[in-house]
Amino acid sequence: MPPKPAPGDNEGNASGSTPTPPPPPPARTAEEARLRLAEMEREREQEQLLEEMNSNTPAEDARNISRLTQLAALLRREQTNVHVTNMALEIGRPALQPPPNMRGDPTNMYSQVSSDFLWKIKPQRISNNMATSEDMVKIQVALEGLGVPTESVKEVIIRLVLNCANTSSSVYQDPKGVIEWDGGAIIADDVVGVITKHSTLRKVCRLYAAVAWNYMHLQQTPPSDWSAMGFHPNVKYAAFDFFDYVENGAAIRPSGGIVPKPTRAEYVAYNTYKMLALNKANNNDTFGNFDSAITGGRQGPAIHNNLNNANNKTL
C-alpha cells in the first residue's frame, strides 16, 4: 500500500482547492515591517471596495425598494391640505373620573353640580308670550275640522300672520277677506276665531315673527302703514306690532336664519311707537271703576311721558 501524502502535498489537493500560501518570513528591519503593514492595509481596502461593489445583490435591492415604498407611503399619510389651528375641543372629551368622595350624590339636594351634569341637560327655548306647541296642535286639528287640508294648515297660518304684519295682531281687530291655498280658501274670521279659542292672535304671530321678517325683506314689502305710524324710511320694516319677537329663541326660524339682523335703530323706533300706542290705548286705566259716577261718561285723560330726562347729549 502506498504511503499517505503528507499534509500540504500537491497530491493531497486533488480536489482542486487553492493551497494556503506559506506565511512570509519575519521582517528583518523596521522599515520592512512598515512596508508590509502598508501593503496589508492596501489589500484590505481593495477587498472592502470589492465587497461594496458586489453588495447590490437582488435581495439587497428588494429591501431598499421596500424601504423606499414604505417611506413614500408614510409621507403620503402625513401630507394634507388641512391644518387645524386654535384647537380647543370641549365636546366629546373623555369623562372625568373623580375619586369616590368627590362624586356627586343624586339623592342629596345639596350635592355639588358638575359641568358634565349641566352639559347633559339640553336647553329648551321657552317663552310664555307666544303660542306653545300644544296650542298649535289644537289649532291645526280645529282648522282641519273646518275643511283645511293638513298639508295646507301651515300655509294658512303663515298667510294670516303676514296679513297681521300689515294690519295688527290685536284681538280687537276685524279681519277682512279670505285666506287662500292651492285649491281652496277660508274666511279670515274663521281662522282668527279658531286661534283665539286656543291661544291669542298675537301669541301666534310672535311665534312666526322671524318668518314674517324674512318674508318682508325677501319680497321688499314693508308693512303697509309704516309711514302712517311715523316710522322713518330707514326703519320701516320694524313697523309691525310683534317685531320685538323676531330674534326670540323660542320663535320658529327660517331654515336660512334671520336675514338681515334687526338694527339698533329699528329697535329704538319700534319701542318708541310701542310706548305711544300703549299710552293711547291705556288712557282709561287711570280709572279704578268704569261706573259713570267715576268716569263722568268720558274717556280717560291722555297719558304723557316726560322725555326731557333722556340722554340726548353728544359724546
UniProtKB/Swiss-Prot annotation:
Region (Disordered): 1-60
InterPro entries: Carlavirus_coat_N (IPR013569), Pltvir_coat (IPR000052)
Keywords, ordered alphabetically: Capsid protein, Helical capsid protein, Ribonucleoprotein, Virion
GO molecular function, one term: structural molecule activity
One GO cellular component term noted in the UniProt record for this chain: helical viral capsid
Disulfide bonds: none
Compartments where found: Virion
Coiled coil: none
Ranges of biased composition (kind: Basic and acidic residues): 29-47
UniProt similarity note: Belongs to the potexviruses coat protein family.
Cited function: Required for genome encapsidation. Forms ribonucleoprotein complexes along with TGB1 helicase and viral RNA.
Protein name: Capsid protein
